[in-house]
């Protein structure tokens, strides 16, 4: 039987890099990983609950964390089109995040730096595309129409190929199934091919749907 591997882990060190940068004793690795996950979840929940996002606005692409003993730097890469453009507004959000993170994670003797960086081509990032698809499915838009629209968005940003897969009780059908669509090339077995990937879960009125996206950007 064929064995599946995470496309990002498969390419670490070649076309993909880590989003966490720190060192620890082997026995303390799990603590560092747990802290990173809590920070990422906290930031995503903060954005979801405190920032009004317009329909044509993308979300968080990914979060990079750099840690030392007395230093913590968090870089939030976002794809907002019309939001977070003004420096004043950006400063207010960064300051609020700074205060809440220090309060919730008890960073007293640790310098905390937060940077919010806007990515130029948001729909090359599968996380942002998955959020778009999830939003459409929640609003009961046809899954075929949604997948075709997702492909159009990525094609407009110089991608070489995309594959979208949706699984679960699609359109409220009683029997779960898997539907997928591919456009262009998606060479999953080529290590040198730079492929961005994400797995996303969305809750709808008919149950949970799984979304998987592979985007082939370039070959290095």
Swiss-Prot record:
Give the UniProt subcellular location, in the record's own words: Plastid
- Tell me if Transcription is a UniProt keyword of this record: no
> Biological process GO terms, please?
translation
Q: Which InterPro entries match?
A: KH_dom-like_a/b (IPR015946), KH_sf_prok-type (IPR009019), Ribosomal_S3_C_sf (IPR036419), Ribosomal_uS3_bac-typ (IPR005704), Ribosomal_uS3_C (IPR001351), Ribosomal_uS3_CS (IPR018280)
Q: Could you tell me one molecular function GO term of this UniProt entry? A: RNA binding
Q: Which Gene3D superfamilies match?
A: 3.30.300.20, Ribosomal protein S3, C-terminal domain
Keyword Ribonucleoprotein (UniProt):
yes
Residues annotated as domain KH type-2: 39-120
Q: Which GO cellular component terms, listed alphabetically, does the Swiss-Prot or TrEMBL entry include?
A: cytosolic small ribosomal subunit; plastid
Chief location bin:
plastid
Keywords on this record?
A: Plastid, Ribonucleoprotein, Ribosomal protein, RNA-binding
Family in the record: Belongs to the universal ribosomal protein uS3 family.
Q: How does it assemble?
A: Part of the 30S ribosomal subunit.
Q: What is this protein called?
A: Small ribosomal subunit protein uS3c
Q: Which organism is it from?
A: Epifagus virginiana
Q: What is the lineage of its organism?
A: Eukaryota, Viridiplantae, Streptophyta, Embryophyta, Tracheophyta
Q: Which gene encodes it?
A: rps3
